[in-house]
From Swiss-Prot:
It is an enzyme of class 2 (transferase). This is Mitochondrial transcription factor 1. Coiled coil: none annotated. SUPFAM superfamilies: S-adenosyl-L-methionine-dependent methyltransferases. Mitochondrial transcription factor that confers selective promoter recognition on the core subunit of the yeast mitochondrial RNA polymerase. Interacts with DNA in a non-specific manner. InterPro entries: KsgA/Erm, rRNA_Ade_diMease-like_C, SAM-dependent_MTases_sf. GO terms for cellular component: chromatin; mitochondrial DNA-directed RNA polymerase complex; mitochondrial matrix; mitochondrion; nucleus. Its EC number is 2.1.1.-.
Length: 366
């Protein structure tokens, strides 16, 4: 079963060529009302084909959970590509009721519209308790072998700090097997505005290297499925000369658009990022890891040998252990890889004075 394409005229949000069945909303507060949505279905179709994700799923049993699709451009694209058994759509904006109800009808009920906001965590409990979302839970053995083959999460995230906070929480929950992580190694696809994109993808040597980007590298396998040249240029500008010379700084998108990837209603330049949970490392304490990353990233330009003192009295005695594990302790903290942070954390877990890591107040650097 294939759904008809949604053309720009039918998806535009108050644009100059809009047919008028949608109206300008009163954008407010922390909600998906601040989410822009993709209007170019051809681009979405092409990104999915290039991703080759179809082979990763059992379509006959697959559930797609989609947040803030707007009029359903991405809903149509995802449904046509994966042909899932169930496609649950979280969209609270009443203005999109007609196009979403139409998709529910055309899909013979396989698309289910839930009139709730995916920005709020209570929504996910509601759809789970009501059995609207009822995927199989992976066993630990299955998680060692592959990501979840029957559940995919897709979302347009809000712009500004709200979007950054949401993607940071997604990473926290997937790493701890909370939220959708309770079902196993769940893959997420996110259309992100430019600011959260740069924060999420900025790797070692990036001037604003964040806890969010370290968590992405440490706990997920990630790819950029689609990005514009302008977003890639902004990302490149944030790297030091040393990082550009010594490390792979480009996310190597599968699809690069020469023009901004247009969204409505905010005309934002979007990037499509894929993240999939890695198998859990039972030897790692995630709270200790998070504390260490937050503390050390407050002094990105300082060498590890000097910033180690922030981790507790006598922590410098651990430096030889770091060196033995291949970590360059004279390297600025901002150049450490996620693997370096993981190694440091496992060593410090055995350190008797690490308790203070959970008690200090560290400025949020997500």
């Amino acid at each position: 079963m294939k759904l008809p394409k949604i053309l720009y005229d039918a998806a535009a949000f108050g644009g100059p060529r809009s047919t008028g069945f949608v109206k300008i909303l009163n954008l407010n507060g922390r909600s998906s009302y601040k989410s822009s949505y993709l209007v170019n279905q051809n681009l979405m179709d092409e990104a999915l084909v290039k991703s080759n994700l179809l082979k990763e799923y059992n379509s006959e049993k697959m559930t797609i959970l989609e947040m803030a699709p707007g009029p359903g451009v991405t809903t149509t694209s995802l449904f046509n590509y994966f042909q899932p058994k169930s496609h649950v759509v979280l969209e609270s904006r009443e203005v999109f009721s007609k196009p979403l109800q139409k998709l529910c009808t055309l899909s013979d009920g396989r698309i289910k519209w839930v009139h709730q906001d995916g920005y709020y965590w209570q929504t996910y409990e509601d759809v789970y308790v009501s059995k609207v979302l009822d995927p199989r839970i992976q066993t630990e053995e299955e998680q060692k072998l592959s990501p979840h083959r029957e559940l995919l999460f897709f979302a347009h995230l809000p712009h500004g700090y709200a979007g950054l906070l949401f993607v940071s929480q997604i990473l926290d929950f997937l790493s701890a097997r909370d939220w959708l992580g309770i079902f196993g190694r769940v893959r997420v696809l996110l259309w992100l505005p430019c600011s959260p994109t740069v924060t999420l993808l900025g790797s070692r040597g990036f001037s604003k290297r964040s806890k969010t980007s370290v968590f992405r590298e440490a706990f997920t396998d990630s790819r950029v499925l689609a990005a514009s040249e302008s977003t890639l240029q902004k990302l490149c500008m944030g790297y030091s000369k040393e990082a550009k010379e010594n490390y792979q700084i480009s996310p190597n998108p599968l699809l690069v658009s020469p023009t901004p990837i247009t969204s409505e209603p905010h005309k934002e330049d979007l990037t499509l990022v894929e993240m999939c949970s890695k198998p859990q490392d039972k030897q790692l304490s995630i709270p200790v890891f998070e504390s260490i990353v937050r503390i050390l990233l407050t002094c990105k330009a300082t060498s590890l040998s000097k910033s180690i003192y922030y981790l507790g009295p006598g922590a410098e005695t651990l430096l030889p252990s770091f060196t033995q594990c291949g970590i360059n302790i004279d390297m600025p903290v901002g150049l450490l890889s996620a693997a370096d942070f993981l190694t440091i954390s496992k060593i410090i877990q055995k350190y008797p004075f690490k308790h203070h890591l959970h008690l200090g107040t560290i400025i949020e650097d997500s």
